[in-house]
Structures are given as structure tokens and as C-alpha cells.
Amino acid sequence: MNKIYKILILVILFSCNSKNILTDTGEDSGGGFTGEVGYIQDLNVELISVYDSQTASFSAPFGNFVRNFIVHVPPDYNSENQSLPLVFVLHGYTSQAPIIRQYSGFDQISNEENFIVVYVQGTTDIYGNTGWNAGSFGAFTTVDDVGFFRSLIKYFKTVYNINEKKIFSTGMSMGGFMSYRLACEVDDINSIGSVTGSMGRYTPCQPQTKKSIIHFHGEEDTIVPYNGGDWLYSANEAHEFWKNYNECGNQVSITLPDLNGDGQYTKKLTSYNCEDSKIVELYSLEGEGHTWYSKNWGHDVSSSELIWKFFEDQQ
């Protein structure tokens, strides 16, 4: 199958709830999404650009903002006979969706493990910095990010063939905070992963369903302190919250091998025997700061691979 034909198929796969599809060149190609449009009538998605035969970017007006996201599907994705997991990946404060796409490596994991990954772009504050209404940051309180993700999930359920029991979110820093908020407020989210992001003390969290949580945090993080503060939970407090909420019966802590030989270790705390087969994990990285952890960059663990393995194991 030649590349042009693959791209043509991609455009069809990435069709949207509007009367026109915008192609890579911006030309009007006609057509449009022909399925159950009523389910996505609150989110009018337009194709912006086709990157390659597996990846494209989209925009959708929502509230007072135009929202953007990048979708990557695995090779040979066929919506007619494949029901795949869906993973949202959220950037940190001041960052961008293309940046976390580059450093997290989820495209490659998606190709190998067969799931759909979506890199969502936050909105901007008055200083032009991107971020999320994670409930703890005043600059974004007017943005209905929770509502947007609910609509985005509805869109993917309708346009793509999604395994509705396997919808996940992960993020870096403020993207981790936002993933925690989605765990608290969006029932469709099965589990979340956070890298250097925690929970706000003054953000209500009353989930209606049990959620599995995996959290990575450097003990020397000076941006989002490992030990928390007046307005945010420590990494251990966030773990304790979900351990209690999930009614976990057992807990074990192990020290992982010092793979890079720097004399500093990663401790893995696991709460298990929880209700609904949920699990809560905390990786505490001795001597590490505010970053996305990867063995390729000299860390003892690789966040992305462990997050996906954790998601894959969830029921």
C-alpha cells in the first residue's frame, strides 16, 4: 500500500463532526463524519494537518477557546475490527503537546503495544503560558478542562473504535495534576499516571468509581516538592488518599536496583488487594528533581514504559 493511499485512509479515519474535512493542504475535500453525530454534537472537530500515515493534528472550539490535540494510531490500525485502549498525554505548565510527544516516546510504545495516544494542548494564561485548570492554579479557573475531556472522550468513543474500559490519562507536572483531577471527576477514566504532579489540598476529589494510580516523583523536586506544601499533597499523601479511597488491604515497599550506579535508589510503594482490583503505586526517586524519568537519560526507571505496563494490566 503506497504512502499516499495510507494518508488518504488516515484522513477518513480522522474524519470529524462537520460538513467539511480540512486536508493537510487546507483544501476543502467535502465528506465528513457519517456516524452517530448526535453523540459529538458539542465538539466540532476539524482536521488541521496530517503528519504521516499514523499521526494528525486537530482543533475543536470548546467554551471560549479553540482546543488542539495530536492523535497517533498504531500501524495497521483498523477501526472496523480493533477496539483499542486510549491514552491521553498532558504536558506541563508552559510546555506544549508536541514537546511531550517528543520526549515521552509514547508514539513508539503505541506502535509496539497497539493503543491510541492523544497529546492534548492546554490553554494559555494572560502571560501566554500554557496550562490546565487542575483545580489548584488560579490562572486557568475559567477554563472547563474537565468538560472538554468529557466531550473529547465522547468524540473518540464515537469516531474511533475505543475499548471503553481502557481510557487513561497521564501527564508531566501540571499535566499530572490535571490527570489527577480527571481521576477525581471523570468516570470514564480507568486509571491515571502522574510524573512530578500531585493533588491540590483545596481541590475536592469525590470520584464515583475506583481508580488505579501510578505516580513518579523525585525526592529533590523543587518545582512541585515531593513533601508537598500548604496547597498541595505530598507524593505520599496522594498515595494515601487513593489507598484509602480504593480500600486497599495490603502495602509493600521495595527498593529497585541502582542501574546507573550513582548510589541513589528508587523506592516503589505499592498498595494492593484493593476494591475492584485496583492498585496504587508510588515511585520515589532519591536525588532526582523535576523531570520525566527515562533510562535513556541516566535514570533508574523509565516512566513511559512503566506507565503503559501499569495501564495495560488494569481491568
Each predicted region: which residue ranges?
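Conserved alpha/beta-hydrolase "acid-adjacent" motif
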Residues: 222-234
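Sec-dependent signal peptide recognition
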Residues: 2-10
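Short beta-strand/loop motif that positions the catalytic acidic residue
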Residues: 215-217, 221
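Acidic, glycine-rich loop-and-strand cores that form catalytic or ligand-binding grooves
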Residues: 231-263
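Serine-hydrolase catalytic machinery in alpha/beta-hydrolase-like enzymes
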Residues: 65-73, 77, 82-168, 178-181, ...
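Catalytic active-site module of serine/aspartate enzymes centered on a nucleophile-bearing elbow/loop
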Residues: 299-315
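A domain-start/cap signature at the N-terminus of enzymes
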Residues: 16-86, 112, 141, 170-193, ...
